[in-house]
Amino acid sequence: MEWLYSLFIEHSALQAVVVLSLISAIGLGLGKIHVCGISLGVTFVFFAGILAGHFGLSIDPQMLNYAESFGLIIFVYALGLQVGPGFFSSFRKGGVTLNMLAIAVVILGTFLAVVCSYTTGVSLPNMVGILCGATTNTPALGAAQQTLKQMGLESSTPALGCAVAYPLGVIGVILAVLLIRKLLVRREDLEVQEKDDANKTYIAAFQVHNPAIFNKSIKDIAHMSYPKFVISRLWRDGNVSIPTSEKIIKEGDRLLVVTSEKDALALTVLFGEQENTDWNKEDIDWNAIDSQLISQRIVVTRPELNGKKLGALRLRNHYGINISRVYRSGVQLLATPELTLQLGDRLTVVGEAAAIQNVEKVLGNAIKSLKEPNLVAVFVGIILGLALGAVPFSIPGISTPVRLGLAGGPIIVGILIGTFGPRLHMITYTTRSANLMLRALGLSLYLACLGLDAGAHFFDTVFRPEGLLWIGLGFGLTLVPTVLVGFFAFKIMKIDFGSVSGMLCGSMANPMALNYANDTIPGDNPSVAYATVYPLSMFLRVIIAQVLLMFLL
C-alpha cells in the first residue's frame, strides 16, 4: 500500500497532478447533474476541492500556488483572445453603458460592505476578505493581504473570510441571473436576440437619381460616402450584372446593396431612392444571373493574408466575383475594401465557377491547416500579460502601488492581441474547440486549487456563529447589487439579457457564473459583455480593496 500513499498523500509533483486531476474529474462529473434544471458545470470542481481539503487531502504549497496561478492565467488569456475581435466594437454598441453599470455594481457592493462592517462589528480586514469572496475576486484578496503586510498588520485574516463567502459568491451571481430570467425574461427575448445576432447585415435596393454620382465609378462613390456598402448586383437595360469597383454608375441604374440597416437612410440620400422593402420586385429578377453563377464560402487560411485589407487583394477586379459577407467568430461583417482579414475568416463569394476556383487558390481554403495550434501567440501573450500585471500604478493619496495582477494583465493583453494581432501579422486564430479546451482546463485547475486550499478550515469556520454571519453578509454583498443593477439594466435600460448576464458576471469577476450563462443563453453576448467590463471592474476591485484598508483602518 506504500505506492498508494505516495500517489495520494506524500507531497510530490506526481501526487499534485494526481490529486488535482482527481478533484477536477469528480467535480466535472458531478457538475453535469441537473437539479431543478440547474447544473453548476465546472463550478462543482471548487466544491469538490473544498471537500477534499476538509478530509485532509493536500499538495505541496508551492505546487498549489503554481497550478492555481497558471490555471487562472490560461483561462483569462484565452477568454480575452476569444472576445478580442468584438471587444472594441462593443464600445460602439453599448460598451460604455455596460462599464457604467459594472461600476455601479462595484460601488454599491463596496458601500454595503462598509455599512455592514460598522453595523455588525465585523473588523474591516475580515469584511474586505468577505467582500473579495462575495465578488469571487482573489486578486483583490492578494492586494488586500499585501497592503496589510505593508501596514504591519496580520495579513491572513481576510483569507478565511474570502473562503467562507466564496461558495455563495459563486452561486449568488448565478441565482441573480436565474432570478432576473425567471421574473423578467420571456422566451421571445432570447429568440429575438439570437436572430439579431445572426443578421447583422442588411440588403436593400436603390435606384440612382442623384446627379452627384452620375458617370462616377463605384470606387469613387465609395470614397465619397461615409456609410460602408457593397453593391452585389446592378440592373441596367434589362440585364443583371455583378459590377466591379471600376464600373461606371449611370442615371436610372438599379442597385442591390449589402449594408447595415442603420446606414440605409444615408445611402438613400446618396443614391437617390430606396426601392420597396421587398427588393425582389416583379420587374427585376435579381437572380437572373444566378444560373451562370455559384455561391461558395471560402476560408482564409494563407498566413500571408493575415492582417491584409480585403480591397488590397483586388479580387473583384481580377476575377469578376463579388464578396457579400464575411463571417468571423460567429459575427457577420460587411465585406468592405477596408476590412482587415484574419486567418479563419469565412468569405461568401459569388461568381462563375472558374473564377471562384481561382479565388480559392488566392485565399487558401485549406481548412485542415487551421486545426494546427498557433501556440506562439499564446505564450507571447501570457508573458506580456504577466509583465503588464506586474507593473505598479501609483494612485495619488495611496502609498502602495496598485497592480492588475495575474488576472487583469493577461485578459487585457489577450483582448489587445485578439483585436490588433492580425494587423501586426501575428497569427492569433484558434478553433473554437481549442479555445474552449484552454479555458476549461485553466478554470478547472484554478478552482481545484482554490477549493483545496480553503477546505481545511472551511467547515470549522462555517459552523461557528461568526462564520454564519460572514456567510450571510457575503451572500447579501453578492445578491443585492447584482439583482438591483441587473433589474435596472434589463427592465429600465432595455439591454439584452445575454449582455446583462455577462456584465454582472464580469463586474463580480465570476468566471463560473459566466460559464453557466454561456451554457444557458444563446450567442456570444455574455462572453463579450464579460470581457468588456472585466478589466475595468478588476482594476477597481483591486484598488478598492487597498483603499478601504488604507483610509478606514
UniProtKB/Swiss-Prot annotation:
Report the Pfam families cross-referenced here: Asp-Al_Ex, TrkA_C
- InterPro entries in alphabetical order: AAE_transporter, RCK_C, RCK_C_sf, YidE_YbjL
- Positions of disulphide bridges: none
- The primary site where this protein sits is membrane
Q: Which UniProt keywords apply?
A: Cell membrane, Membrane, Repeat, Transmembrane, Transmembrane helix, Transport
Query: Which Gene Ontology cellular component annotation is one that this UniProt entry carries?
Result: plasma membrane
A Gene Ontology molecular function term of the record: monoatomic cation transmembrane transporter activity
Q: Which residues form the RCK C-terminal domain?
A: 190-273, 281-365
Q: Where are the transmembrane segments?
A: 13-30, 37-59, 69-91, 98-120, 157-179, 375-397, 402-424, 436-458, 468-490, 497-514, 529-551
Membrane topology per the record? Multi-pass membrane protein
Query: What biological-process GO terms show up in the record?
Result: potassium ion transport
Which SUPFAM superfamilies does the entry mention?
A: TrkA C-terminal domain-like (SSF116726)
- Domain of life, per UniProt, equals Bacteria
Cell location: Cell membrane
PANTHER family, per database record: K(+)_H(+) ANTIPORTER SUBUNIT KHTT, TRANSPORT PROTEIN YIDE-RELATED
Family to which the UniProt record says this protein belongs: Belongs to the AAE transporter (TC 2.A.81) family.
Its recorded name reads Uncharacterized transporter BF1818
